[in-house]
Amino acid sequence: MAKIALKDVRKVYGGNVEAIKSVSMEIADGEMIVLVGPSGCGKSTLLRMIAGLEGISGGQIMIGDRVVNDLEPSDRDIAMVFQNYALYPHMTVRQNLAYGLKNRNTPKEEIERRITEAAKALEIEQFLERKPRQLSGGQRQRVAMGRAIVRKPAAFLFDEPLSNLDAKLRVQMRVEIRRLQRSLATTSVYVTHDQMEAMTLADRLVVLNAGRIEQMGTPIELYEKPATTFVATFIGSPSMNLLAHGAASSNVSAGWSVNAAAALPPTVATLGIRPEDITLAEAEPADAAFAGTVQVDAVELVGAESYVHGSFPDGTTIVFRVPGRSQLRIGEMLKIAAQAKDFHLFDAAGKRI
């Protein structure tokens, strides 16, 4: 186990394409960090740089008390888990688990002990004599994780390991990964584009945007206090509603308004409201900080609740949550409201106020 530290790490391609822009972070010993962001944000590149699969153009990477900039991946004391499993098809599960240890001349008794421990933790004991083709996708991913676990590395690096699994199995596997990581207390860096996966797994999240860290913090910190409009719309599903706060916000014809009593700062350019913080109203309540009349465009039933997609007369769209199985009709007009305590305020640059 070891901490990981990045200081002003950069990656430049072709002399002028900067993929990673002076990224600095410290990952504590035993911490689970999740790198999340849209395609092309640099999360996989950053993981590969930590692993040594991608060279760095500047800065410093430390694993434990060693600077690893110039070390080969095999010398960094890390273990990686990929989305494509990377198992040897002609070997049994037991042989796959043992392969890396044999190459390191680990004693036979120690190999067997580690395989037994990992197989028990991953519940794959009954599959040890099978070959990968005889396993399901979830079982193969457990074996891939087992191969990383038996190495007892200083850190685990996960590169979108659940991407090939169906939705139900992804939920099951991410819970298992979190349970295992906590029990092993091994420093871990996990890459995903799935913000729900990120929220479930992370001790802290790192949201990346165009090669930069947009915000780093616990899942609840990023959800409740997004630093920018980018984070506000990326973390949370459905996304936070962002409304342009200007002349239209006091224009009755827009179909929505902000009560003057809310006393928003003059620097507010964008008003953010989470879907769950918007309520239906019989009439526009006098004490509501935000109120409006919206047309129902679509209703998304997700089980115990529904999400209503609507639009105001000025064309502004909004999403809000209603409990239960909604009987709302497409085209129906509804009155909605929200309180000032639930507002997220951003300036013209998209920064939180």
From Swiss-Prot:
ATP binds at residues 37-44. One of its GO terms (biological process) is glycerophosphodiester transmembrane transport. InterPro entries: AAA+_ATPase, ABC_transporter-like_ATP-bd, ABC_transporter-like_CS, ABC_transpr_MalK-like, ABC_transpr_MalK/UgpC-like, Mo/tungstate-bd_C_term_dom, NA-bd_OB-fold, P-loop_NTPase. The keyword NAD does not apply. It catalyses: sn-glycerol 3-phosphate(out) + ATP + H2O = sn-glycerol 3-phosphate(in) + ADP + phosphate + H(+). It is an enzyme of class 7 (translocase). It comes from the Bacteria. Belongs to the ABC transporter superfamily. sn-glycerol-3-phosphate importer (TC 3.A.1.1.3) family. This is sn-glycerol-3-phosphate import ATP-binding protein UgpC 3. It comes from Agrobacterium fabrum (strain C58 / ATCC 33970).
